[in-house]
Amino acid sequence: MVDEPLEPLEPSLQNLIDQQSLKWIFVGGKGGVGKTTCSSSLAVQLAKKRDSVLIISTDPAHNISDAFDQKFTKVPTKVNGFDNLFAMEIDPNAGLNELPEEYFDGENEALRVGKGVMQEMINALPGIDEAMSYAEVMKLVKGMNFSVVVFDTAPTGHTLRLIAFPQVVEKGLGKLLRLKMKVAPILTQFVSMLGMTDVSADSLSQKLDDMLRVISQVNEQFQNPDQTTFVCVCIAEFFSLYETERLVQELTKCGIDVHNIIVNQLLYTHKSCSMCTSRFKIQEKYLDQIADLYEDFHVIKLPLLEKEVRGSDGIKAFSEHLITPYEPPATNDQK
């Protein structure tokens, strides 16, 4: 018996918009494929259905400020033209120093001293600094109770580290907590010399315990397809498709749901010049491969436009193509 070919899934991100249980949506892929435009557009569409939406840039280039033509910082800021869409930018390479100082406000000086002590301890554990930065941000974000959070991620290598950060942090914090008994007497003696009698190693330990609890919850949510999914963005070229397949495989290994792929920057008219014709044929070739590789995915096709997509109005207009498949205007150019 020969299996009948699967019916293509709807070429739209409507499935994500309708999935009210989603809490975390990651958008990523190779550099230069238009991830930021796509993630910003997705956030705009989600804002139509959800009470509050946050888009976070974890790319040091911080392109969402350029996309919305508005300056964002490490504190969630309302996007111009929206009542329920917020944006923030973090630099994962900055570690705990990137966090707002208000985060370390507490009943006493322990948390402020703890910032420096934690940073020094964390620096002794290779690979955990970036993960801890993500961990602190996730703790902040969870406390803000946004309906859904969209991550505009850095190129693939950084993205995979972001996805894996809960496991890295859980392992690293376990080591830190095991060091507590060794560090506590030294820390207590040090702060008493400075006259800060209300500072204790236990307060720092409690902070680590609290964070570990949050990260354990995040880890569970990341691997729950009802709460977390990943949207891959690519262009119809060899290297981008290769990177996308690698990303899909790595996400699957990590237990992260992925069933939507955006193919961006597609040509729809091509006979006006020889280069356009050549590019069109290349894209057709890789679109066929994408159809074969990802027959059980929603594949969304987005156009290469004549003008940049910038500003809230531009993003709003472009975001409609995530829901309703793009139809090029009729011209003599088309087949």
From Swiss-Prot:
Transmembrane domains' residue ranges: none
The UniProt record lists the keyword S-adenosyl-L-methionine: no
Keywords: ATP-binding, Cytoplasm, Endoplasmic reticulum, Hydrolase, Metal-binding, Nucleotide-binding, Transport, Zinc
Residues given in the record as Zn(2+) binding sites: 273, 276
A GO biological process held by the record: tail-anchored membrane protein insertion into ER membrane
Subcellular location as annotated: Cytoplasm; Endoplasmic reticulum
Active site: 59
Main EC class the enzyme belongs to: hydrolase
Pfam family of the protein (one): ArsA_ATPase
Top-rank lineage group of the source organism: Eukaryota
GO cellular component terms given for this protein: GET complex
Binding, ATP: 30-37, 237, 264
Subunit-structure text: Homodimer.
HAMAP family tied to this protein: Asna1_Get3
Record NCBIfam families: GET3_arsA_TRC40
The family this protein is said to belong to: Belongs to the arsA ATPase family.
Protein name per UniProt: ATPase ASNA1 homolog
Organism of provenance: Drosophila willistoni (Fruit fly)
Source organism phylogeny: Eukaryota, Metazoa, Ecdysozoa, Arthropoda, Hexapoda
